[in-house]
């Protein structure tokens, strides 16, 4: 029970990074997004510097914040349809590229965001870092 979307789980350990939000149904503020992106990069860079093959799940808007690693955008943050559509394929791609750990940005749980976060949370085994 509760693992209906276990097939989304990549072989690598996935950590989801999300801002501490009182209202998860709200969209993230620009400040929250920037704080989250900064933490994803900090965590990823520590692993990259240690010689680990790191995957990073980001959005089109934050792609430039990640100069190293196996970086994959799953679409524009405002286009939840494309993010939802691309999620499974990106997770499988990290398997093909032999990522050892993956860090992912999170999404507000408005509209399709709730389904996206549900799948990401389950794929991460509920390993979440809140910033």
Whereabouts are the PLM-identified features?
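A C-terminal functional module that forms or caps the active site or interfaces directly
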Residues: 2-125, 129
């Amino acid at each position: 029970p509760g693992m209906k979307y276990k097939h989304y789980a990549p072989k690598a350990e996935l950590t989801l990074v999300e801002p501490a939000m009182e209202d998860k149904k709200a969209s993230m503020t620009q400040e929250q997004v920037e704080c989250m992106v900064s933490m994803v990069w900090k965590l990823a860079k520590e692993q990259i510097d240690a010689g680990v093959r790191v995957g990073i799940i980001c959005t089109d808007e934050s792609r430039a914040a990640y100069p190293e690693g196996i970086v994959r955008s799953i679409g524009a943050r405002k286009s939840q349809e494309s993010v939802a559509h691309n999620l499974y394929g990106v997770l499988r791609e990290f398997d093909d590229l032999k990522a050892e750990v993956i860090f992912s940005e999170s999404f507000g749980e408005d509209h399709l965001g709730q389904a996206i976060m549900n799948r990401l949370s389950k794929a991460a085994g509920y390993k979440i870092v809140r910033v």
